[in-house]
């Protein structure tokens, strides 16, 4: 939880964190909805990356989607973030995935520069949409027998 809270602080989204240790245990271990890598230096967890599968109908292949990555500020600039990305890329290649994707806040210039240094390209023609809470429930209530 400490990494999640620290990431939320950095992203100016602390109030949005509703995860609990119990909800993380349920979704990550019981449901296996995502996987987590930890960066460990001198026996201490100093960063993490949470990822899961997505799928491209155009490629006809699964992909790797990075939901969150965070390295403690005092450990940045030491290659830890790059090592996490390299390991995620290795996993994607090993599993035969067609791509490795993630989103980044548009104001996060340090991260954008870092991602570009890795060879990643932004997708300015795409806009992310999200349904949560009441909007998600309302739309779910509109479901009918057309979809199977």
Would you name each region that the model predicts?
Residues 4-26:
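Conserved GNAT-fold acetyl-CoA-binding loop/helix
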Residues 44, 54-66, 76, 123-124:
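A conserved beta-turn-beta hairpin within the catalytic core of GNAT-like acetyltransferases
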Residues 89, 97, 116-125:
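Conserved acetyl-CoA-binding loop of GNAT-fold acetyltransferases
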Residues 101-111, 123, 130-134:
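Conserved beta-strand-loop-alpha-helix junction that forms the acyl-donor binding cleft
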Residues 92-104:
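Conserved GNAT acetyl-CoA-binding A-motif
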Residues 26-38, 65:
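A short helix-loop-beta-strand connector motif used in the catalytic cores of GNAT acetyltransferases and
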Residues 34-49, 72:
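Conserved beta-hairpin
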Residues 71, 77-90, 113, 117:
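Conserved acetyl-CoA-binding loop-helix of GNAT-fold acetyltransferases
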């Amino acid at each position: 939880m400490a990494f999640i809270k620290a990431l939320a602080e950095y992203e100016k989204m602390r109030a949005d964190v509703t995860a609990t240790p119990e909800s993380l245990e349920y979704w990550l271990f019981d449901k296996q909805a995502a996987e987590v890598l930890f960066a460990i230096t001198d026996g201490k967890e100093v960063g993490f990356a949470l990822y899961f599968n997505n799928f491209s109908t155009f490629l006809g292949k699964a992909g790797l989607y990075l939901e969150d990555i965070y390295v403690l500020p005092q450990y940045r600039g030491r290659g830890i973030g790059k090592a996490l990305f390299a390991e995620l890329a290795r996993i994607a290649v090993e599993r035969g995935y067609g791509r490795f994707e993630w989103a980044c806040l548009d104001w996060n210039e340090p991260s954008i520069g870092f991602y570009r240094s890795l060879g990643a390209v932004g997708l300015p023609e795409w806009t992310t949409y999200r349904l949560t809470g009441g909007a998600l429930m309302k739309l779910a209530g509109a479901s009918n027998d057309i979809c199977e």
